[in-house]
A protein has these predicted regions:
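Short, low-complexity Pro/Thr/Gly
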Residues: 1-446
């Protein structure tokens, strides 16, 4: 009996002859509202503001962005002679700046330009499974870039001997002939993607600013432009049964509702060193460590946007290690080697980088992610869990707050041209609690 000490009693399911089925009685109705921008100016560079109307008896469950656009060459429609494509993640990258405020006081988003474009790209790449590829392509034109090297995914859809970037070629088919393309994406903020609905009578304002054409397009020149023809938000609400709604309001009057979410943040570290070995210290402000961090190297001109570069391809490197309070995070640095393919010298065996990434995003036991061995050259990054138990991004609990010094060492590699003007991109997740009271006061705790 020792082996079952501490175990709980159980009855086999085939003996439960009178077990019932749960009945949903709390939600009376689900409905959606289309929210159009306050101004009709969609392409003049100003912010497009959306005011989601508060509902007295319904709770906000989800917000989606629907955007219709066309790509043209000047004022002319595209022809078969034009080699142009949209970048990946266009449904989110369309907006260079996204601002979300609650009750006109609490700002929820990072204010840095293009932070939303990169955060959503990382979100999709790290959290979506490969078997969602067809859905993401159909709904949001999200198709991963491909090619042997980073250069293959940079600009042109076609390059001499044929298609180099098949992902870009697939996206180019959507815009051929300057036909109208409509894409849909959830509003990417943890407060709007959590399983909990927001209370009634919430005043929410969302501001979207269109990104630069040079950031959004892959082409051989700046002759092309992208115009938004229509845009609206779809806000979905749940209306509880009056009895449950009253119970919720009574509880809120006594105790604020807690939303345990994460705060995504994109940190940029300019790299001033011109040598092969990069060393950076004190990566996080105040020494406070995030729950997880993903490291990639990018060129400054790619981050700000240029038609002849791809913002969503990163620069590979030879080795990586992070020291926390002087202790190496990896017993041996993550390293790769080189090989020659199609006459080009490229990074070869990257399995330990991919293995580390899959462990942090919890894909090591759950199948392939959007980033895999076929496109890792374009999406070269390192995932690190800095939680006390080194748990992955899907861990559904808070970790102890940790403070530590950090020192990063990256070897860019041998015999490769080292680009100037490099940036270290760090995509972080921080634990955050948002409390909403009965008077709809919002408190953020980190």
């Amino acid at each position: 009996m020792l082996k079952i000490k501490g175990s709980q009693d159980a009855i086999s399911n085939d003996l439960l002859l009178w077990s019932g089925v749960k009945t949903q009685v709390a939600v009376q109705e689900v409905y959606s509202i289309k929210v159009h921008p306050v101004s009709s100016q969609l392409n003049d560079g100003s912010a497009m503001s959306f005011n989601i109307p508060s509902q007295a008896k319904a709770m906000l469950s989800k917000v989606e962005i629907f955007t219709s656009f066309k790509v043209k060459k000047g004022d002319n429609n595209l022809t078969t002679e034009d080699s142009v494509s949209i970048i990946n993640n266009i449904a989110n990258a369309m907006f260079g700046l996204v601002q979300i405020s609650i009750n006109d006081r609490t700002e929820l988003c990072q204010s840095m330009r293009n932070s939303y474009a990169y955060q959503t790209y990382f979100d999709n790449c790290l959290n979506c499974d490969l078997d969602r590829s067809d859905y993401l392509n159909a709904v949001s034109a999200f198709v991963m870039d491909s090619g042997v090297t980073k250069a293959d995914a940079e600009t042109m859809v076609f390059s001499g001997d044929g298609v180099k970037n098949k992902g870009a070629a697939k996206r180019a088919q959507r815009i051929a002939g300057s036909k109208t393309v409509t894409v849909c994406t959830p509003l990417h903020h943890p407060l709007f993607t959590t399983s909990k609905a927001l209370p009634t009578n919430m005043k929410i304002r969302i501001s979207l600013t269109k990104n630069n054409d040079s950031f959004l397009l892959l082409a051989d020149s700046d002759a092309y432009n992208i115009k938004i023809t229509d845009i609206y938000l779809k806000a979905t609400f749940l209306r509880p049964n009056d009895i449950f709604l009253n119970l919720i309001e009574e509880r809120l009057a006594k105790e604020a509702a807690s939303y345990f979410i994460t705060r995504p943040e994109l940190i940029l570290k300019p790299i001033s060193e011109s040598g092969r070995i990069l060393r950076l210290n004190n990566l996080f402000s105040d020494g406070r460590l995030p729950k997880t961090a993903f490291f990639a190297i990018q060129r400054s001109k790619d981050f700000s946007g240029s038609s002849i570069t791809n913002p969503y391809t990163f620069i590979p490197f030879g080795s990586f290690n992070l020291h926390v309070n002087g202790v190496p995070h990896f017993a041996d640095p993550l390293e790769t080697n080189y090989e020659t393919k199609d006459g080009q010298k490229i990074y070869g065996d990257c399995w330990n980088f991919l293995k580390q990434l899959y462990e942090v995003i919890d894909k090591d036991k759950k199948g392939a992610g959007m980033i895999n061995s076929t496109n890792f050259q374009q999406n070269f990054m390192v995932g690190v869990s800095l939680a006390s138990d080194r748990s992955g991004i899907t861990a559904g609990y808070l970790n102890q707050q940790m403070h530590a010094s950090t020192n990063l060492t990256i070897d860019l590699g041998y015999d490769l041209n080292i680009a100037e003007d490099l940036l270290l991109l760090i995509f972080c997740h921080w634990d955050r609690v948002v409390k909403i009271s009965g008077t709809r006061e919002v408190e953020i705790i980190e």
